[in-house]
């Protein structure tokens, strides 16, 4: 098990070379208040004076101290890493050793070896001032120091700045918060052991070290308490209850030590002498606890705790390193290798982008969105949901009222009163309604164009990671595709405009669907006319027979008798037969007298009997209405524009409006169905499919030129740096994986 700590030290070195903190390695973190004796405990464990000492805040940067045990008989003292597969970055190992029993090495000084521990202390001070300044500033950047000695056990310790309350010197006002966050960053590592240092001449219940330790380790499974300055307690008091755990119990134990005083340091008292005096003090003051306290016992305890902790953390550490190695390998692959054949690389990237673009439209892309519709699926949604619902929301009679229809009918007849509804009025009104379908159709083209623009960004972000290496090539491809889409937009709009113009060019009243609708409406209108005449004709006939009676004396309403109804039906049948005969023979009759070429097609559907004309005439007699009639007392100006007057429509006007409305609605639905079917087809042919078919040839023609190779395949400034960082991290992870793989299972027990 002793071999586990050097393994962790090697892993620490490997990851320090790349400045990575992604792997949390097992280590011992020393925490405590300022001047509580943290650095003195570390020096006692090392057995040499190597840390800066003094009053106030001395430790101003984290110090990661690795203690490496070497055999005393080893005459050739080196870094101990000549045969290690994982070595420090750019390390050139010395061919000769160092003739000294103990030596140190800093990570930031590369291969320089220090045999003078005063020089080590001076280098710590210099490195601290280089980053933290020469006053009282604190920095979170750690200093890495490795000590080789036959007098130490294998340990990895972290000395942190002491907790303080009031800023001094050039320290910021929030120095307490900064140091607290720094300590929490190290002790929050679940693979660390917390060494909580508290001075014996203070109340343990007020220990800041134990308080902050419990925040991250409430169960105390990885916290060991150290009581320093046992020789400085008030006379008549001792730390027996504290060391026995009766005041505050600590699961891993409480160990007391005696530090060198500042006077001892000034008198150059060695650590060896200090440890000997410590043992004598413990035998005298705490004889029953002497064998479970002191610096030597603390070192052995820490070594044992660290080894067991490493054993527990090792399986998870192996898994973590393997996962990270796979991730960085994938990341490095996405960055690609340096370009050798630029011509082949350019053609490959162009082809891949064109393929991914077309696949995104077809729905066979490698990277498929799950949060929203994109590509061909969104185009389908635009066709059948957005465009379809928009067309269905267009009212066939929107913008038309009864006055508009009557005005169109009158304008279509010219100066002659019309007996039938002119076909010209129907065409005029239905074309006006069909024209309203053009705007949503053009909007459909615009939406598809926008989606095809979005596909460019989708392919750049998800499908072709290689393009991120070459930002100029990426911009050039986007520009070419955008120009291609922009060129196809007017062509597609023109085709959609023509589709609507085609419908406007010829109103096909012989359309099969429209003929069926006309037949149904003819039967419906004929039936309504029969019913209306059956109710109203008897009263009109009676008023005609008694024409000498003033109309004002006629009854307001009269129910038709059965005899009158039979008479009305007989007259209606005779009238219909007479009209049919006249229409077939072409002679005599009202229809023959007023027939016009433009209205012949409507006669079968808009037949008007004499009885109905008589009824309309009777209805119009009581209320003679002139359009735009002047008020009494005013002169009539023939140059005035006629103003429509609101009035109750006659039966014929109601019938004409109803016929026109139904015909417009029927024909509009036919045209809308045609537009809903033909516009998506036109968009697919003139825009989507054309871009798919010509995209690659357009890209090759515009970009595949020898004069553009060097410029287009210029990598971004940070791409080379990111590739190098990923390669270094991958190398470190592979080295760490090799180190862990060399651990024998027997080492764990």
From Swiss-Prot:
Residues 568-581 have a biased composition (Basic and acidic residues). It is an enzyme of class 3 (hydrolase). Its main location: cytoplasm. Keywords: Acetylation, Biological rhythms, Coated pit, Cytoplasm, Cytoplasmic vesicle, Endocytosis, Glycoprotein, Golgi apparatus, GTP-binding, Hydrolase, Isopeptide bond, Lipid-binding, Membrane, Mitochondrion, Mitochondrion outer membrane, Necrosis, Nucleotide-binding, Peroxisome, Phosphoprotein, S-nitrosylation, Synapse, Ubl conjugation. Residues 657-748 form the GED domain. It comes from the Eukaryota. Residues 258-261 are annotated as: G5 motif. Residues 228-231 are annotated as: G4 motif. Residues 74-93, 536-604 are annotated as: Disordered. It catalyses: GTP + H2O = GDP + phosphate + H(+). Residues 515-582 are annotated as: B domain. Residues 22-315 form the Dynamin-type G domain. There is a cross-link at residues 545, 548, 571, 581, 607, 610, 619, 621 (Glycyl lysine isopeptide (Lys-Gly) (interchain with G-Cter in SUMO)). It is found in: Cytoplasm, Cytosol; Golgi apparatus; Endomembrane system; Mitochondrion outer membrane. Belongs to the TRAFAC class dynamin-like GTPase superfamily. Dynamin/Fzo/YdjA family. This is Dynamin-1-like protein. It comes from Bos taurus. The gene is DNM1L.
């Amino acid at each position: 098990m002793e071999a586990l700590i050097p393994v962790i030290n090697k892993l620490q070195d490997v990851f320090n070379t790349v400045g990575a903190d992604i792997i949390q390695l097992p280590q011992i973190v020393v925490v405590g208040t300022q001047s509580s004796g943290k650095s003195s405990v570390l020096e006692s464990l090392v057995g040499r004076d190597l840390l800066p000492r003094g009053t106030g805040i001395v430790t101003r940067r984290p110090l990661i101290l690795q203690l490496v045990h070497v055999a005393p008989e080893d005459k050739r003292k080196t870094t101990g890493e000549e045969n290690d597969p994982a070595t420090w970055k750019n390390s050139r190992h010395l061919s000769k050793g160092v003739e000294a029993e103990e030596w140190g090495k800093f990570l930031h000084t590369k291969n320089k070896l220090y045999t003078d521990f005063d020089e080590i202390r001076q280098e710590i001070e210099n490195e601290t001032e280089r980053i933290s300044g020469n006053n009282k500033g604190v920095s979170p950047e750690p200093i890495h120091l490795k000590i080789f000695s036959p007098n130490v056990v294998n340990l990895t310790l972290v000395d942190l700045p002491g907790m303080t309350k009031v800023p001094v010197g050039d320290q910021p006002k929030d120095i307490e918060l900064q140091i607290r966050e720094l300590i929490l960053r190290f002790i929050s590592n679940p693979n660390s052991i917390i060494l909580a240092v508290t001075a014996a001449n203070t109340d343990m219940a007020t220990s800041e070290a134990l308080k902050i330790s419990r925040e991250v380790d409430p169960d105390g499974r990885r916290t060991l308490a150290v009581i320093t300055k046992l020789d400085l307690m008030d006379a008549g008091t001792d730390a027996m209850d504290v060391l026995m755990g009766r005041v505050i119990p600590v699961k891993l134990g409480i160990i007391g030590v005696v530090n060198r005083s500042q006077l001892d340091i000034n008198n150059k008292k060695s650590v060896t002498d200090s440890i000997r005096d410590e043992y004598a003090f413990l035998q005298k003051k705490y004889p029953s606890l002497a064998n479970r306290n002191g610096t030597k016992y603390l070192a052995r305890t820490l070594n044992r705790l660290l080894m067991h902790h490493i054993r527990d953390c090792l399986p998870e550490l192996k898994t973590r390193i393997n996962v990270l190695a796979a991730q960085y390998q994938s990341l490095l692959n996405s960055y690609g290798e340096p370009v050798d054949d630029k011509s082949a690389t350019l053609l490959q990237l162009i082809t891949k982008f064109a393929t991914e673009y077309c696949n995104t439209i077809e729905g066979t892309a490698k990277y498929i969105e799950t949060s929203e519709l994109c590509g061909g699926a969104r185009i389908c949604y635009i066709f059948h949901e957005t465009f379809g619902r928009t067309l269905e929301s267009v009212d066939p009679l929107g913008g038309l009222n009864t006055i508009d229809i009557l005005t169109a009918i009158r304008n279509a007849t010219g100066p002659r009163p019309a007996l039938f509804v002119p076909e010209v009025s129907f065409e005029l009104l239905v074309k006006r309604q069909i024209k309203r379908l053009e705007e949503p159709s053009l909007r459909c083209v615009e939406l598809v164009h926008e989606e095809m623009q979005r596909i460019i960004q989708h392919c750049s972000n998800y499908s072709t990671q290689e393009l991120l290496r070459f930002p100029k090539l990426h911009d050039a491809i986007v520009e070419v595709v955008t120009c291609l889409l922009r060129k196809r937009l007017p062509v597609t709009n023109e085709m959609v405009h023509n589709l609507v113009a085609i419908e406007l060019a010829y109103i096909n009243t012989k359309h099969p669907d429209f003929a069926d609708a006309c037949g149904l409406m003819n039967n419906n209108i004929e039936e309504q006319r029969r019913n209306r005449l059956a109710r109203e004709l008897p009263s009109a006939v009676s008023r005609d027979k008694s024409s000498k009676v003033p109309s004002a004396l006629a009854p307001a309403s009269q129910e038709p008798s059965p005899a009158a109804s039979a008479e009305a039906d007989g007259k209606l049948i005779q009238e219909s037969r007479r009209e049919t005969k006249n229409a077939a023979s072409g002679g005599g009759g009202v229809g023959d007298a007023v027939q016009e070429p433009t209205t012949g097609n409507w006669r079968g559907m808009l037949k008007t009997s004499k009885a109905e004309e008589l009824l309309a005439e009777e209805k119009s007699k009581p209320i003679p209405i002139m359009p735009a009639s002047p008020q009494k007392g005013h002169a009539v100006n023939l140059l005035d524009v006629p103003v429509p007057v609101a009035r109750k429509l006659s039966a014929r006007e109601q019938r004409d409006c109803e016929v026109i409305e139904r015909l417009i609605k029927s024909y509009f639905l036919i045209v809308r169905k045609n537009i809903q079917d033909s516009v998506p087809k036109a968009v697919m042919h003139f825009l989507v499919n054309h871009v798919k078919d010509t995209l690659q040839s357009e890209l090759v023609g515009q970009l595949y030129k020898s004069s553009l190779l060097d410029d287009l395949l210029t990598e971004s400034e940070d791409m080379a740096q990111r590739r190098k960082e990923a390669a270094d991290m991958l190398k470190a992870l592979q080295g760490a994986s090799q180190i862990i793989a060399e651990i024998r299972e027997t080492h764990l027990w």
